[in-house]
Amino acid sequence: MTGPERKIQLAKVAHVYYKHKDLERAHEFAMDFGFEEVSRTNDKIYYRGYGREPFVYCVIKADENEFGGTAFAVENEEELEYASKTLPNATEIYELKDAPGGGKCVTFKEPVDGFLWHLVYGQKLRDEERALPTLKFNFPTKKERAPNTYQRFEQRPAPVHKLGHFGFCHTDWQKAFDFYHSHFNFKPSEIQYDENGKNCMVFSRLDRGDELVDHHSFFFFQGPKAHVHHSSFETHDFDTQALGHDWLRHKGYQNLWGVGRHIMGSQIFDYWFNRDGFVMEHYVDGDLLNSKDDTKWSSATPDTLYVWGPDLPDNFLV
């Protein structure tokens, strides 16, 4: 089979959709997780973070609880036109009529397990993002805080800034790898292999040349049953993240894993189940890379996933 003529140029990961039977139950979690409601229709609720994206998360009323796909912004409208003509099961370009920020979109199904993807262009960004305070710290040999000042915090959800990444379990790792990395400007930041030396997990970033980007905006691993693993949202700093952890704990939500520090990507992580069993992550302090950084390889063992934190749950990669 011949490959595509060229790669579709993705600019950033934009937003994600989840479908729920009980929209108000999904909304309750969204507010406790730190999203801000932007608008709603009869069957959708849109949420933003405190960044400039018009929305980063959307829940949709549906007969079943299921993943609704992730959207990436493309470089220009020509990329949308090319995508609509070359990607499998792709739609024509259509208007995002009820979505905050508007814009145009192409939706397609990837050929391995049929996950939905959305490519968008022309969304109007918010005029400005809300600035949160950058704290100063008193280290043993360097005291940054002014004299007679205090660190005081408010108990509240951890406000979301942006969608950082998402991930799948795919049933054919190599086929998925070949499709994504030949059709889009993804570059593997880290690849892991199993005990037989077979590749089984990849963390991929967008190749934007010299521009610094997150260590990964997309990851996937090999498994017997295809499913979305989690969507991850950046919050402000570690105190904010820890306050959000306590907020969710006191609200009775189930923690999957965290708080801890990843090795690949370096993020401080905190994974939670919503009421319908989908996994959402708060993260802070992730690595930034550009095209000059080469792919790293490692064995897929539990100790490569984190350097500190609670023990790795048995069901984390199920």
Residue ranges: model-predicted function:
Residues 2-6, 12-21, 61-86, 88-159, 162-171, 202-205, 252-318, ...:
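Vicinal oxygen chelate
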Residues 8-54, 111, 168-213:
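Core segments of cupin and vicinal oxygen chelate
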Residues 1-24, 69-70, 131-174, 187, ...:
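N-terminal beta-strand motif that seeds the catalytic metal site of vicinal oxygen chelate
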Residues 16-18, 29, 38, 48, ...:
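A structural feature that tracks compact, well-ordered secondary-structure segments
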Residues 1-107, 121:
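An N-terminus-focused feature that recognizes amino-terminal "leader" regions
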Residues 43-44, 66, 100-104, 196-198, ...:
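Short acidic/glycine-enriched loop/turn segments that link adjacent beta-strands
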Residues 173-260, 267, 274-276:
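Structured core of small recognition/catalytic domains
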